[in-house]
Swiss-Prot record:
This is Nucleoid-associated protein CE0210. GO terms for cellular component: bacterial nucleoid; cytosol. InterPro entries: YbaB-like_sf, YbaB/EbfC. It comes from Corynebacterium efficiens (strain DSM 44549 / YS-314 / AJ 12310 / JCM 11189 / NBRC 100395). The keyword Cytoplasm applies. GO terms for molecular function: DNA binding. Binds to DNA and alters its conformation. May be involved in regulation of gene expression, nucleoid organization and DNA protection. Keywords: Cytoplasm, DNA-binding. Its main location: cytoplasm.
Length: 107
C-alpha cells in the first residue's frame, strides 16, 4: 500500500479551510426574516444571530391582550433563529462532511 502524499493532503486541507471560511463569511453577510401570524410580526436576524429589526403590524397590538403579542414576537424570533441555523447547515453541511461532523450545531 502506498503512503499518502503529505503535500497533497496539506493542499486539500488548506482548500477545505478556505471553503469553510468563505461559507462562514457568506453566512455572516446574510440575513433572514422570521415571522409569526402570517407576517404580522417579523424579526430580521443577521447570520451571526443579531436581531436587526422587529416589525409589528398595528393590527396585532391589543392593550388588553399583551400575552398574544409577546407570543408572536417570541415565535418570530424562534423562526428567524431556526432559519439562521438552517442557513448554516446548508452552507457548512457539505463541507463539514469532510470532517465527519455536523457544523450546523455550531450556530
Amino acid at each position: 500500500m502506498t503512503q499518502p502524499d503529505m503535500s497533497q493532503i496539506l493542499a486539500q486541507a488548506q482548500q477545505m479551510q478556505a471553503q469553510l471560511q468563505a461559507a462562514q463569511q457568506e453566512i455572516l453577510a446574510s440575513s433572514v426574516v422570521g415571522d409569526a401570524a402570517n407576517g404580522l410580526v417579523t424579526v430580521t436576524m443577521s447570520g451571526s444571530g443579531e436581531v436587526t429589526a422587529v416589525n409589528i403590524d398595528p393590527k396585532v397590538v391589543d392593550p388588553e391582550d399583551v400575552e398574544t403579542l409577546q407570543d408572536l414576537v417570541q415565535g418570530a424570533f424562534l423562526d428567524a433563529h431556526k432559519k439562521v441555523a438552517d442557513l448554516a447547515q446548508e452552507k457548512m453541511g457539505p463541507l463539514s462532511q469532510g470532517f465527519g461532523g455536523d457544523m450546523g450545531s455550531l450556530f
